[in-house]
């Protein structure tokens, strides 16, 4: 007899391509039936068969304070009673912009949009408009949304599907995008020496969360900052994932790097669709209505999403919030690593703030190439063993995981116990 999840997936595929509204949700990489979620609270969510899971995707990052936090829910309810959307400015937008600028000092001015893709796309257009140049640099395996010029050897879902690029991206778009190796400062410097005067910007994830978890090295970021300044290119940090996730000031505060522009999302919406891009005021002044770079959005600064974001940003400013979040994430990855050693499984893990990566390899990957050598078959087996035990990990070997403030010791201990059994099962399967 099929489960309710099976029935819903079959039904969804009749009206929605692949049965999902974002590819990774289809479980194509790991196999099996996607779980259709009915509710979530704290560190848990429940599927259509009323099965509870410890959630380690957290809506792919936004649920940093846990699902359905009472303060966030109340803020949304209160805002909704005053109107869902106005298409006109509100005081709440100003307050959110002021708070972002205060928490992220490199951002002097900021504009709110509705998605990370929109924010990254707009930041690129702004950089091109401000510099009068066309070429951009991105890095293999990094994902900055699905805008055409950025789907060139992109990470995330495209890695999951084994495609280096997306169909439908014209050659004329791609030719202006230079794709370099992540964490290779020498290559970056050489490219600038060859064509620095034609490069508008460099965009990078300081903590790449779309080829599992791969932090940038200090030398890589420092070289990037230096050559961008030297050649007049705009340095863009894509902190859609790491912003307010790894530290209150984002990854840039951890690494001591000051970008020209920053892209934010996920956490700043508290679970609702909102993103932002901002940075130096002299660059931001190129945006319409002040300058010639056009950007607009019907739902930009939506009052309900802003309310959810402001409530979340207030909660994460609590004393000790990030220390506790980091400690719990560290406890999780150390526990998983110890369990793998007990089973003699080649495995390692890493974390930054509330983000973590799991690698079926003997050493933590430091580049796209080493990441691609991780054992995806073993990851898939581990994923399903954990899923059967009620622990929901990212359904792809190329996606980072997320811990929330509601993942207490009991939740972490339960997850480690499940991992110990899963690794033992993998070891038994190898012996057979």
Swiss-Prot record:
It catalyses: (S)-4-amino-5-oxopentanoate = 5-aminolevulinate. The modification N6-(pyridoxal phosphate)lysine is found at residue 266. It comes from the Bacteria. It is an enzyme of class 5 (isomerase). Its EC number is 5.4.3.8. InterPro entries: 4pyrrol_synth_GluAld_NH2Trfase, Aminotrans_3, Aminotrans_3_PPA_site, PyrdxlP-dep_Trfase, PyrdxlP-dep_Trfase_major, PyrdxlP-dep_Trfase_small. One of its GO terms (biological process) is protoporphyrinogen IX biosynthetic process. It holds the Pfam family Aminotran_3. Pathway: Porphyrin-containing compound metabolism; protoporphyrin-IX biosynthesis; 5-aminolevulinate from L-glutamyl-tRNA(Glu): step 2/2. Keywords: Cytoplasm, Isomerase, Porphyrin biosynthesis, Pyridoxal phosphate. Its cofactor is pyridoxal 5'-phosphate. GO terms for molecular function: glutamate-1-semialdehyde 2,1-aminomutase activity; pyridoxal phosphate binding; transaminase activity. GO terms for cellular component: cytoplasm. It is found in: Cytoplasm. Belongs to the class-III pyridoxal-phosphate-dependent aminotransferase family. HemL subfamily. HAMAP family: HemL_aminotrans_3. Homodimer. This is Glutamate-1-semialdehyde 2,1-aminomutase. The gene is hemL.
């Amino acid at each position: 007899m099929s489960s309710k999840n099976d029935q819903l997936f079959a039904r969804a595929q009749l009206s929605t391509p692949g049965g999902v509204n974002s590819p990774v949700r289809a479980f194509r990489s790991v196999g099996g039936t996607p779980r259709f979620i009915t509710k979530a609270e704290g560190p848990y969510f429940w599927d259509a068969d009323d099965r509870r899971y410890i959630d380690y995707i957290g809506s792919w990052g936004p649920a940093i304070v846990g699902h359905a936090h009472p303060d966030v829910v109340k803020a949304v309810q209160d805002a909704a009673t005053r109107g869902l959307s106005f298409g006109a400015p509100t005081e709440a937008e100003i307050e959110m912009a002021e708070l972002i600028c205060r928490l992220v000092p490199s951002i002097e001015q900021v504009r709110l949009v509705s998605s990370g893709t929109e924010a990254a796309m707009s930041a690129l257009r702004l950089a091109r408009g401000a510099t009068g140049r066309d070429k951009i640099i991105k890095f293999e395996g990094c994902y900055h949304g699905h805008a055409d010029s950025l789907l060139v050897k992109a990470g995330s879902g495209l890695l999951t599907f084994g495609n280096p690029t997306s169909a439908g991206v014209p050659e004329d778009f791609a030719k202006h995008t230079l794709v370099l190796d992540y964490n290779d400062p020498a290559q970056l410097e050489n490219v600038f020496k060859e064509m620095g005067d034609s490069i508008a910007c460099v965009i990078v994830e300081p903590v790449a969360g779309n080829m599992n978890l791969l932090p940038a090295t200090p030398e890589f970021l420092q070289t990037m900052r230096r050559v961008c300044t030297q050649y007049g290119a705009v340095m863009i940090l894509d902190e859609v994932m790491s912003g307010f996730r790894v530290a209150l000031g984002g990854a840039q505060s951890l690494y001591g790097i000051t970008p020209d522009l920053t892209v934010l999302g996920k956490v700043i919406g508290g679970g609702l669709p909102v993103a932002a891009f901002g940075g130096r005021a002299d660059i931001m002044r190129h945006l319409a209505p002040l300058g010639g770079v056009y950007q607009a959005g019907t739902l930009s600064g939506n009052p309900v999403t802003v309310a959810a974001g402001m409530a979340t940003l207030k909660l994460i400013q609590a004393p000790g919030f990030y220390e506790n979040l980091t400690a719990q994430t560290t406890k999780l990855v150390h526990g998983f690593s110890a369990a793998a050693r007990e089973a003699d499984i080649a495995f390692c893990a890493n974390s930054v703030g509330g983000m973590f990566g799991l690698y079926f390899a003997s050493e933590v990957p430091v580049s796209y190439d080493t990441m691609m050598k991780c054992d995806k078959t073993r990851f898939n087996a581990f994923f399903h063993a954990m899923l059967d035990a009620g622990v929901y990990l990212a359904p792809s070997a190329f996606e980072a995981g997320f811990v929330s403030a509601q993942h207490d010791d009991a939740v972490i201990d339960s997850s480690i116990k499940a991992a110990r059994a899963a690794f033992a099962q993998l070891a038994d399967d190898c012996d057979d």
